[in-house]
Amino acid sequence: MSRWLMQMLMLPLLLLPLGQAAPKDGVARLDPEAQQQLTTNPFQPGPEQLRRLRDYLKGLEKMEEDPEQMNREQVLLYLFALHDFDQNGQLDGLELLSMLTAALAPGAAHFPINPVILVVDMVLETQDLDGDGLMTPAELINFPGEAPKRAESLPPALQEPQPAGSQPLLANSPLQSETQQSLGTKEEITSQVEAKRALEPEQEAGHHIETKVDALSPEGEARGQAESEGDAPGPREDAERQVESKDNEGEAKDLPAETLETQNTPNVVEAHSIQLENDEI
């Protein structure tokens, strides 16, 4: 009897530690939906992943645009800018952990060990292509196996930081390919102009040779004679020129007489004035 009583008294003492160690609802236990979300990459293209991220943005009070009207790239870029606390254009592990915890499992922040760390490791292993432990906007948007997005779709503030003298990571963007094509077209036009200039002296020399050959040929001689005959004055033109020359000679003969009369006029006037003075005296 006493032995059975002792066992009954010891039983609560044994169950007390187990009750304290059991997880409590809402504090140390995730709901099944959150546990399922932690098993997949939230940045993987798909309607379900996009719905989760949009739901998170809907809960933010400072959203100016309706998340339902935003596509996948816009949602990811907004999340990137929202959690890039040091504004260096890259997300480190802590910033990525803060983003995924707030978007996928807000209650996991109170866990002694955040289970979202496994998702961060999954994202870095899948999308951190250069292995530097940092996520850039291009790495966040361009999921492996998908077609790369256009580089100009990224806002200037989210462009990847590049060290001095290095090539941009998005060097194969359509914008740069168009620039290279325009440069190639310009080089082709320049080469064509230079080739044309190089051929101009040869064309001029060929033109002079053709002119000389044409002049030496019988047809060229006949053409030259016809042109010289066309330049020579005809009989009618000779007669007109002779008449004009005679008229000019007549005018030239009349001019000296008129000139003499003009020169003698002052002498006559002077003699007449002297005669008047003598009469008065």
From Swiss-Prot:
Tissue-level expression: Expressed predominantly in whole brain and kidney, with limited expression in heart, lung, liver, and skeletal muscle and no expression in spleen and testis. Also expressed in pituitary gland, adrenal gland, digestive tract, and reproductive organs.
Molecular function GO terms recorded: calcium ion binding
Gene Ontology CC: one annotated term: extracellular region
Key words, A-Z: Calcium, Cell adhesion, Cell cycle, Growth arrest, Metal-binding, Phosphoprotein, Repeat, Secreted, Signal
Induction behaviour: By p53.
Principal location listed in the UniProt entry: secreted
Localization: Secreted
Residues reported in the UniProt entry to bind Ca(2+) 2: 128, 130, 132, 139
Region (Disordered): 146-281
InterPro entries xrefs: EF-hand-dom_pair, EF_Hand_1_Ca_BS, EF_hand_dom, ER-Golgi_Adhesion_Reg
UniProt comment concerning the protein's domains: Both EF-hands are required for function.
Name of the protein in question: Cell growth regulator with EF hand domain protein 1
Source organism phylogeny: Eukaryota, Metazoa, Chordata, Craniata, Vertebrata
Gene that this polypeptide is encoded by: Cgref1
